[in-house]
Regions:
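Extracytoplasmic gate region of multi-pass secondary transporters
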Residues: 34-35, 217-260, 267-268
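A late C-terminal transmembrane helix in Major Facilitator Superfamily
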Residues: 334-372, 379
Length: 410
């Protein structure tokens, strides 16, 4: 085995940083840039409620299905090439959505985007593990912060761009970042794996690894944590404005500002949480903070919504700090590249697989009871569900260690 050229390693890592940042930005901006433009799009062609409902359901569905398939794609085509195809699908979908001539074209473009995002979500922790195994906390901070920025930025500027240049430009402008992100991954995909980066685990991937995740407590704990974070986030993005209007008596405009506050709370968490987990080993205290905040936030909206809606929303928005915690833990709770991909795929596909029923389930429950009591109680229960998962993750065992203790050699 030849010794890697230090200059080639350095260049590979620089390309990887740029690629990871642009990938992370595209994974969230593609999701967050559409809904503010429905009114503007509706002036050009009809947007049936059924199609809008499908567009709202497609993201978690695609994240679950394609997250499940991502490990197989990576085994077959390799990490860089799979990343390249996923990001290409996002870029192509953004262009297709901007060029849509009817609601079904919009749906097709969105489905293509979310399929790429579903695969990309799984691959990002594996990319960090491969290229920056000794800097997992730092790189996770970089890309989760990028994700946080690209979540709240598009809704803020989508309408102004549409007013100035049209809704097609407002949708299509985000494709620039996806296309730019293709460049480093093309270079890294073409380069030999042996020369792409140092300290890379190149063992032959095993098709059995993903199947083992179903039998490991840490894998299930991460899946439950991912579900708790994504369920609260997606339910809030879908229903929090209406909950606030109905229960706290705020105006729709104020409710929109409060929803932005909910999203903005994730930014400081993305800056701090990965470092606390990777460098300090702080895990269970973060779970306690997140769980307690979720209980207090949903509980406040339940028993005294009008007294301090800003406080309740800020508290509820604290629970998704579990998202960067999960992404950091995926790299820290594995020894091998293959296990990292499998664990990321398992946690995200299971988490999103259950989450996709939350927004529509909350809507059905509200219609059946004509009240927000039951949905808020469910959010309290989900917040509490994270605590036992935190106890398991705090044990600091890798999935390989768990398997070896229970079943013998990995």
């Amino acid at each position: 085995m030849t010794t890697p050229d230090p200059l080639a390693v350095r260049r590979g890592r620089i390309l990887a940083v740029v690629g990871i940042v642009l990938l992370a930005f595209s994974l969230r901006s593609a999701v967050a840039s559409l809904s503010p433009l429905f009114d503007a799009i509706g002036e050009d062609f009809d947007l049936p409620a059924a199609v809008l409902g499908l567009i709202g359901t497609v993201p978690p569905l695609c994240f679950a299905v394609f997250g499940l398939l991502a490990a197989g794609f990576e085994r077959r085509f390799g990490l860089e090439r799979t990343t390249l195809v996923a990001l290409g699908a996002v870029g192509l979908g953004l262009v297709a959505r901007a060029a849509a001539l009817d609601a079904y074209g919009l749906l097709f473009g969105s489905a293509l985007i979310f399929a790429g995002v579903g695969v990309g979500n799984v691959l990002v922790p594996a990319l960090v593990k491969k290229y920056f195994a000794e800097r997992i906390g730092l790189l996770t901070t970089v890309y989760t912060t990028t994700m946080a920025v690209s979540t709240f930025l598009p809704p803020l500027i989508a309408v102004p761009i549409a007013d100035a240049a049209g809704w097609r430009t407002s949708l299509g402008v985000w494709a620039v970042f996806a296309v730019a992100g293709l460049i480093p991954w093309i270079v890294l995909a073409v380069r030999s794996r042996r020369a792409a980066a140092a300290d890379v685990d190149l063992e032959a991937p095993s098709t059995r690894v993903f199947g083992r995740m179903w039998r490991l407590p840490t894998a299930w704990a991460l899946a439950i944590t991912f579900f708790a974070s994504s369920a609260v986030a997606y339910t809030s993005f879908a229903w929090l404005p209406k909950i606030l209007v109905d229960t706290a008596g705020v105006t729709p405009q104020v409710a929109g500002v409060l929803l932005s506050l909910f999203a903005l709370i994730g930014l400081p968490a993305s800056l701090v949480v990965p470092a606390l987990v990777a460098r300090r080993g702080v895990v269970l205290p973060l779970f306690i903070v997140a769980s307690a905040s979720g209980v207090l936030g949903a509980g406040g909206l339940l028993v005294a919504p009008a007294s301090a809606p800003w406080l309740w929303v800020a508290l509820l928005g604290t629970l998704p700090l579990l998202f960067p915690l999960v992404l950091t833990s995926v790299g820290l709770r594995t020894r091998t590249h293959d296990a990292t991909v499998a664990l990321s795929a398992f946690a995200q596909s299971v988490g999103y697989g259950v989450t996709m029923f939350m927004p529509i389930g909350v809507g059905i429950l509200h219609d059946a009871t004509d009240s927000w009591t039951a949905p808020l109680v469910i959010l309290i229960g989900i917040s509490l569900l994270a605590l036992p998962a935190g106890v398991v993750i705090a044990r600091r065992k890798t999935v390989e260690q768990e398997w070896e203790q229970r079943h013998g050699s990995w």
